C-alpha cells in the first residue's frame, strides 16, 4: 500500500529532535507504518509525488495537497480547530468542499466544534498517541 504522510512545515523533517508536536506525531506514524507499507513522509509536493497514484494520503491541517495529488483515500488529520474564516484565509475551503475527505480529529472537542459545513465524507476521533 502506498501511503503519503504530508505535513506543511518549515521544519527539517530529517532531524526528529528539532520537530514540533504535529511533526513528531507524523514522524512517529511514519516509523510505525514504514515496516508494513510503502510510506513517504514529505513537506513538499514534488513532481515525483504527483506522478504516483497513492492509496492513502494523510495530511495534517492542510487540505490543499488533495488538489495536487491522486489518491483513493484522502485523510485530513486535524490537530487544531478549523474555523471557516481560517479555511478561507488559508485557501483550504474549496479543497475541503470539493474533495472526498475523511477527517480524523485528535479529540472529541475538535470533532464537536468543527462546522458541519465541512461536508467530510467521514469523521473519526483518534486521540494523540504521544506518551
Predicted regions and their residues:
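Short loop/turn segments at strand-loop or loop-helix junctions that form parts
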Residues: 5-10, 78-80, 128
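Short loop/helix-cap segments at secondary-structure boundaries that form the rim of catalytic
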Residues: 47-53, 64-71, 114-118
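N-terminal pre-catalytic "stem/leader" segment of glycosyltransferase-like enzymes
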Residues: 1-53
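Short, well-ordered alpha-helix to beta-strand connector turns
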Residues: 37, 52-55, 71-72, 99-102, ...
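A generic structural signal for short, well-ordered alpha-helical segments in conserved domains
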Residues: 30, 111-115, 123
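Carbohydrate-associated surface elements
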Residues: 109, 129
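A conserved, positively charged/aromatic
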Residues: 75-76, 87-101
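Active-site proximal beta-strand in glycosyltransferases
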Residues: 56-85, 103-104
Amino acid at each position: 500500500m502506498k501511503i503519503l504522510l504530508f505535513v506543511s512545515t518549515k521544519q527539517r523533517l530529517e532531524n526528529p529532535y528539532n520537530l514540533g508536536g504535529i511533526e513528531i506525531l507524523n514522524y512517529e506514524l511514519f516509523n510505525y507504518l514504514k515496516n508494513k507499507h510503502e510510506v513517504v513522509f514529505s513537506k513538499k509536493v514534488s513532481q515525483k509525488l504527483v506522478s504516483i497514484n497513492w492509496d492513502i494520503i494523510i495530511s495534517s491541517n492542510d487540505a490543499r495537497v488533495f488538489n495536487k495529488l491522486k489518491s483513493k483515500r484522502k485523510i485530513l488529520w486535524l490537530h487544531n480547530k478549523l474555523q471557516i474564516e481560517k479555511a478561507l484565509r488559508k485557501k483550504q475551503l474549496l479543497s475541503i468542499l470539493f474533495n472526498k475527505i475523511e477527517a480524523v480529529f485528535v479529540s472529541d472537542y475538535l470533532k464537536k466544534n468543527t462546522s458541519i459545513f465541512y461536508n467530510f465524507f467521514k469523521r473519526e476521533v483518534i486521540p494523540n498517541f504521544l506518551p
